[in-house]
Amino acid sequence: MNGSLSPSCAGVPTFTAHPRHDGHYVKALTLLGALLLSTPLFAAQLTLELGAQSHTWQTEALLKHSEVKTITVSNDVSYKRTMTYRAVPVAALLTGIKSDDHLQAVALDGFAAEMPAAPLLNTEGAQAWLAIEDPAKPWPRLSADKPSAGPFYLVWTHPEAANISPEQWPFQVSSIKRLAPVAERFPALLPDPALKADDPVSQGFALFQKNCLACHRLNGAGDAQFGPDLNIPFSPTEYFGADFLKRYIRDPQSLRHWPQAKMPGFSEAVLPAGDLDKLVEYLTHMAGRKVKR
């Protein structure tokens, strides 16, 4: 035996290394520490559910992908500064996907970004990338009490070329799925079918899908598990005046400030005044189309 039992000050036996084996004991601990440091801190995986082309990617395989490269992202939505990533073009991962398909990117915390495939397939202008966190080179934390944006983060280069919204930058992504369009999956979200496509309410519905549905449900419809339902039991248009609601959407902390607030503000660059008006018109319209539960 390499040691002996001795009583601790609390009366609980403790193991003490035998003096003549101290050197071997220290060497063993050193070797174990080196082994642990050389092992990846985590083994993350990304699931792509693309019908017949479904595939699961491991971090290591993505970092060795033939199209992986180092990219620089200016004004990163999550980190609020310029960031550098090892990343693969999202288009290179979407085998079999067509521009008229619909995709959903799901994050570990329940954030579910509904995204048309066309922008994700772009290889020029606004281009989508899957940034991959290398366990040996971990990214910074998003804040002191939050982890990083990894292990997988959907980022964009030149997002201004296609008016990409912050909700189209999902971080901590766990899966990307091909699904039927939102209107088919969740009819409870639909405005009055008598409205024309160019009606402000109909246009507001499109803006709701792009900017709100990743975090919120409406009439109980949607896949997000992040924020409250925006129509049941009440629509925000029923307890906010229109001007205050718009101010809240622009800067939530200007009306309700608390440390754990998670809703981001939507600047004029992301949601122009005319689009904000249409979004509020949609919410007002849907307050009269509540689903009975």
Show the residue positions of the predicted features:
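Axial heme c-ligation environment in periplasmic c-type cytochrome domains
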Residues: 225-231, 251-280, 286, 290-293
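Gly/Gly-Pro-rich "capping" loops immediately C-terminal to redox-active cysteine motifs
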Residues: 217-250
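Structured, non-membrane catalytic/scaffold regions adjacent to prosthetic-group chemistry
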Residues: 44-180, 293
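N-terminal signal peptide c-region/cleavage motif recognized by signal peptidases
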Residues: 38-40
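The canonical Cys-X-X-Cys-His
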Residues: 204-219, 245, 263, 279-283
